[in-house]
């Protein structure tokens, strides 16, 4: 039997299409599924064949129930990439600002905030 693994993370965003497009551009992911969600909302699953991020928005576009407010208790989403410099160039080209760069054993990393204020850590162990 294999070890347990995270299959997906579900986050609430104002515009799932915008966030999905950003993730497709930055991480070369694809949309696995898109459709209606609870409470009259809409969800997009974007990722790879092995894992994904579910992007949820409520029934009223831009209106997020307080129980799903961003950042509570989520700290950040970590994404491992092979080429940190190329990914950072795509982050900058998307108009986002990388910050908190660090080289540490065993890898390198930086962070950025998406348009919803969700923090991402991008790390490479290559």
Short names for language-model regions:
Residues 1-20, 74-79, 126:
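N-terminal beta-strand motif that seeds the catalytic metal site of vicinal oxygen chelate
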Residues 2, 34, 88, 92-126:
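Vicinal oxygen chelate
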Residues 10-53:
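Core segments of cupin and vicinal oxygen chelate
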Residues 32, 40, 60-66:
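A short, acidic/glycine-rich surface segment
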Residues 40, 73, 106:
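Exposed loop/turn and edge beta-strand positions of beta-sandwich/beta-sheet ligand-binding modules
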Residues 49-53, 60-62, 84:
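Short, charged/polar surface micro-motifs in flexible loops or helix N-caps
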Residues 54-56, 121:
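Conserved beta-strand in the GNAT
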Residues 70-91:
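Mid-chain, well-packed structural core segment of small domains
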